[in-house]
Structures are given as C-alpha cells and as structure tokens.
Amino acid sequence: MSLLGVDIGITGVKAVAFDETGRQLASAYEEYSLLFPSPGARELDPRKVIEAACRVIQSAASQTNDPVTAIGIASQGEAFTPVMPDGRMIGNTMIFSDARAEPYVRPWSESFGAERAYRITGHIPYTMYSLFKFLWLKEHQPDVWASAWKFLFFEDLLAWVLTGETKTDYTMAARTMMFDVTKKSWSPEIMETVGLTPDRLPEVIPSGGIVGTVKREMASKLGLTPDATVSVCGHDQPVGALGCGAAIPGKASYSIGTVECVCAAVDRLIMSPELMAANLVIYPHVVPDTYTTQGFNATGGSVLKWVRDNFATQEASEAHARGEDPYERIIAAASSEPADVILLPHFGPTGTPHLDPRGAGVLFGLKLSTSRAEVLRAFLEGITYEMKWNLSILGDAGIQLDELRAVGGGSRSETWMQIKADILGIPLTTMKVTEATCMGAAILAGNRASESWAEPIRTFEPRKEYASMYEDRFAIYKEIYTSLSKAREMLSEL
C-alpha cells in the first residue's frame, strides 16, 4: 500500500506517493497560471486547478506498483470557490494576495473590534483573509453570492470532486477569520457580519480527518482503488511543518522560497498582546493539542529573483549556459563578511509583523567605497533580518525556539544557511525531504502524525563571533523601517 500527499499551491500542484516508512515512490507536478483581470486582482481558474490536481494524482498513482490506499490533501489558505450542487464552479478564485477587499478591513474592524476578533479567531483583520473577500464578493458579484450553494477551499474542493462530500479541516477554517479557535467551530457572531450561515460552508473536522472514499467513477478515471480514503489535511504551512518534523513545541519549520515563513508549534493557545500587536496568528496545528503561530516575509525569495533579473544578469547568464543554479552563483559572488549596507526587502506589501500594504524596498548605507559584493551580501542579510524581527517577537511572547528546520529552494545553499543561522541566533537544520507538505499530507492521511519520516542533513550552528555584529545591524534595520513611516506613506500617494 502507498499513501499519496497532494499540495495545491499558488502556481502549481504536486502529488507524491510514499510507502509506509516515508520512502518516496513517485511524484508528479503541473503548473497553472495566475490571472490578473483588474488592478489588485489575483485569481486562479478553479476548474484548471482541479483538473491539474486530478492529472497529477493519476500520474503519481500510475508510477507506483503499490496501490494508493489513502490520499491526503493540503493547500494554500484563504482562497474559496463558489460551487453548485451539480459540481459546477462559479467564476474564479481570489487567492490570498488579491487586494480588492482592502477597503472593507478598516470599517469592519472598527465596527466589530479588532481585539474582539483576535480573541475569537486568533487572527488580526487583514485583507488576505477570506472574511473580507466574502464581503467584496457580496457587493461586487451579488449574482454569484446569491446563487452559490457552498463556498469551498481548495483542499475541500478537490475532496468534494473525489468523494462528493464537503468537509474542511481546522487549519483551513481558521484562515477564513470566521473560525472560533477555542471552540473549534464556525463563529456565528462573525459569520453574521458577513451574512453567511454554516450550511454554505463545509463541515469542519480535525486535520487529517477522512472526508470519504473516492467515487467509483473517479477511481476508475484516476487509476485508484474504489476504497481509497480521502482526507483534508490542512493549510500548507503547518502540514509542511509536520512533514519536516517540526510540529513539536520548541521547533519550527522555515520555508525559504518565494515567500519566507516560519511556522512554530506551541503547546497551548497563546493570545498575547505581543502576538496581536505584531499581527502574528495563533490557531490549531495539524497535530492534536498543539497550536501554531507564523511569521512571514511576503517578498523573500522574490527579492532574490529581482536581483537575478536586474542586478546579476551576468551570473544568471553564465549559470544558464552551464546548467547551474543562478542563485548559487549570486550567493557565491556576495561578500564573505557582514555588510555595512542594510537592505529592507519590502519590494511589495510586507508580511508580519507590519502587514503594511505600502511596503517599499530600501538600500541604506551606500558609499563610494561600497562594493557590488557587499550589496549582494546585504540582500541575503536583509531578507533574514525581517525573519529575525518575527522571531524576536515570538520570544517576547514566551515562545522559545531551539531549532529551525529549513525547507524550500533557498535551503540548498550552505552559505546562505550559515548566514541565516548567524543572524537568527538559532540552529538551522536542512532536511532531506524536498516535498515537506506532500509528506505531511501523506502522514496525516495514513494516521501517522505521531511518527516522523523527516531525515536531517546538516545543522548550521550560530557562530558566536558574528553575534554582536548582527545584533548591531539588526537594531539599525528596525530603526530604518520605523523612521521611514511617513516617507512610505508619501511615496504610496505618488
């Protein structure tokens, strides 16, 4: 028997089959395109997403001799799709970064109360959450709002197509900002402000809970056994944390990709003033009796992509010609010592702790003597200072981390991992698993959450000789951000 983990992302979907010991048997991946129909709009065509998901399931299942007995689905959060009972999907799906709902955030917060909302949901009002996208949909597409039978999130949308049942899990429900994280149920008082009733949303079950078995016609189409179970496993970040063995208090996953995210596990529901002030969420983890809080940098790896395309074209061209990774060449070209130039990596709306839609990148401290190598080093460090800010706030709230487990494309660079460990002051372990979210989903689908399939590769210890140097630079980093508040506002109005 084999277990299949599915990860429905923003730009593509993966399916990976594992045996019962965590050995990878097969995998498949397919991309799809983001849509930008109007200013601020970012959508996916849900029909194409689900079609792609079905194809990768079929492909992965066909590559293994062991029949797939359980499918676990994880996905991006916040995005919902209006559906009809006959299986039709209405319109497109607004993803987390769709900004059209921003005008609804402040009026709703002032009316309901931001702290009151946080005490119920563990989330601070912000445009990414489903609640505000529902308000936008209700006003701007009233026909879709009125005619929709249910609104499903990507994990439960795929599960519905496979089984005919509509269920989601605690973590996905939490990302709507309409879920009571204490009672672990939809919040009637918040849903009332939107004009929604629970019957128009999926039933909520624990992460990894079984939705049903694959419908006979779908099993035949995808090459699955009719008795294969389908589980909704959760929001991709905590599922990925489980996959890399970091769903344990004191540990956190560190996803280093287009977006950087630290997903920490805690053993109790902490709703502290420090977390609230820093926009740091708290909601159930995918592991029972555990909660998660997350800090993220919305423009992490995407800033390095900007460097590649605009500032390091020679390295990128040489790497392409030789079939090498351009980012490794960029990192190798950076200075070997801490830079005296400080980068604020806000090349778009920021992540936590600021959640500032007026984000603006800053390169501070340039001199005639500044070298290109030092500027490249500043980019590597600035992205990491942003995550250090998040981790320092977690520490102030009593959440102490003794290890970060790094996954994602950025974790392949040993040089960058050592820089990050030095700046963060926490041991950083790289992992053998390349598809942590798919592995986490497979673990949950197989009811093996108490096990760890994760294999560490190397731990990078912080070097003491760099500690004070980076603390001094981090203090400057924070001062730059704070001092430029008025300038960011003025720039956004140009």
Predicted segment positions?
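N-terminal phosphate-binding loop and adjacent alpha-helix
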Residues: 28-67
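Phosphate/pyrophosphate-binding loops at sites that engage ATP/ADP/AMP, CoA/4′-phosphopantetheine
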Residues: 53-69, 140-145, 188-198, 220, ...
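Glycine/Thr-rich phosphate-binding loops that ligate phosphate moieties of nucleotide
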Residues: 1-29, 36, 69, 73-111, ...
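Gly/Ser/Thr-rich active-site cleft segment
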Residues: 2, 8-10, 117-235, 304, ...
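ATP-dependent carbohydrate kinase catalytic cores
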Residues: 180-288, 298-299, 315-329, 411, ...
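A polyampholytic, Gly/Pro-enriched intrinsically disordered region
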Residues: 49, 110-126, 223-225, 250-254, ...
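Conserved beta-strand and immediately adjacent loop positions that scaffold enzyme active sites
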Residues: 14, 79, 175, 252, ...
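Active-site nucleophile and cofactor-binding loops and adjacent substrate-binding regions
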Residues: 22, 44, 70-75, 94-97, ...
